[in-house]
Amino acid sequence: MGHCLTKNQQDKDESDHHVDFAGANVTVITTKESWDQKLSEASRDGKIVVVNFSATWCGPCRMMAPFYRELSEKYPSLMFLVVDVDELIDFSTSWDIKATPTFFFLKDGQQVDKLVGANKPELQKKVIAASDLVPHVQN
């Protein structure tokens, strides 16, 4: 399991900004307003939100990104978000992010679970558990 500390960041190369973090059913949150909108949407739709607090310069975050996208495709009953800790510094600080990646699981805007670090098996286990809490509706 790996993680990057959010303090004393390495030199950032902006050319790869958000590379590999978005896609599939993953939404990159770039403003507090988009965060509020997505949480409101999730509450309305009865979805649990999985939030990945991440950084483009963080090796373990980059390693987890494709796996996170795969999970978003496999579990469409959940809402998958990514917050770049460097873009939303004050917001990330308000969530007490000490290391990246940090994953939060939210139901109706409240934390129901958390995982710190790039631990694929544990993330998958928590996503499956969260998915089991969501009523599955056939269209």
For the regions a language model picked out, list residue spans one by one.
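N-terminal leader/targeting and pre-domain segments
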Residues: 1-47, 122-139
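Intrinsic disorder
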Residues: 23-29, 55, 74, 82, ...
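Thiol-based oxidoreductase modules, predominantly thioredoxin-like and allied folds used
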Residues: 30, 53, 64-90, 97
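Structured beta-strand/turn binding interfaces of compact recognition modules in eukaryotic regulators
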Residues: 32, 53-56, 83-86, 100, ...
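Acidic, Ser/Thr-rich intrinsically disordered and amphipathic helical segments
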Residues: 34, 63-70, 110, 122-125
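A short, hydrophobic beta-strand/beta-hairpin element that forms part of a small beta-sheet core
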Residues: 50, 68, 80, 90, ...
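Short cysteine clusters
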Residues: 58-61
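Non-catalytic, surface beta->alpha helical segment in thiol-disulfide oxidoreductase systems
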Residues: 98-139
